[in-house]
């Protein structure tokens, strides 16, 4: 079938298998050009491994180090001529490329928040890897059903204490709009922490440790985004910020646990990129469009694979990691360059419907958004029929 992009709001409801595969190959090629990652991990578990930063971590570990990988994700398979999700096709392509190079790859498809998927993952580690020496936690989800209580918690994107008016882009109509966000209630804050805080990461590490599948010296990291002044009302001072502070508290306990066996636990702060999650946040399309414009002009623009490849080389497996005062690993240094942030802030209120395409890189933002779903990738013939029914080998469901 011939597959074209169909966008509704912040979701593209179609995906292109060949485009997703080409995107994965592009990321692999980038890692290969950078050369081997010295002293990297050998057996890696990535929780949230099918898109964005999690996929980039799996690619960097496998093709930069030669690591065996086990990926956990929650994706929809193709069925009845309906394409699967982008993460499904990304993972299928990853498996194909890993197999071609003789790299061990296993995947588990299901709800990472559940005890069932944790148990299946532990069984797969025992069978295929024995133990893991790196656990990457890269889960982005709007809701979580707690495995112990059965309660489903829904996260919210709201300020705390007062309403906030945010500028943004109505991406459907390509117009500047303002959104008034009301403050989160205490229950909404607690629910957001339950979904996006550190509890599930801790549950994973506790379960892996109790099962004896964490190697001595194992490291774990959880990916997060903090941002700067423009985004602080939402990301640090809002309901999501409370979840991020919970992540900071959680990592201290995990670090103590792993340090006793020569290991480490860190929160890794990465730069803002286009993801399905970030595109749903009212201000982020405008912020990202401005950030792309400014960073591309300075030749410092990076995507997921550049960020995570650099994180492994320069911090996670470096003798001189980039660490902030709270002990977080920082890969967002170029985004937070004072000159970059000052320019973004200067342009923020100048953007109008008429100059959207000149003051910002909204065109680049839209292109990156479509790339998430396999569209707009160089070398792919989008007028040619493509087979949507792609399977993932070594998949546990």
Swiss-Prot record:
NAD(+) binds at residues 48-53, 74-75, 111-112, 139-140, 244, 273-275. Its EC number is 1.3.1.9. GO terms for molecular function: enoyl-[acyl-carrier-protein] reductase (NADH) activity; NAD binding; trans-2-enoyl-CoA reductase (NADH) activity. InterPro entries: Eno_Rdtase_FAD-bd_dom, Enoyl-CoA_Rdtase_cat_dom, FabV-like_NADH_b, Trans-2-enoyl-CoA_reductase. Keywords: Fatty acid biosynthesis, Fatty acid metabolism, Lipid biosynthesis, Lipid metabolism, NAD, Oxidoreductase. Substrate binds at residue 225. It holds the Pfam family Enoyl_reductase. GO terms for biological process: fatty acid biosynthetic process. Pathway: Lipid metabolism; fatty acid biosynthesis. The keyword Secreted does not apply. Belongs to the TER reductase family. Monomer. This is Enoyl-[acyl-carrier-protein] reductase [NADH]. The lineage of its organism: Bacteria, Pseudomonadati, Pseudomonadota, Betaproteobacteria, Burkholderiales.
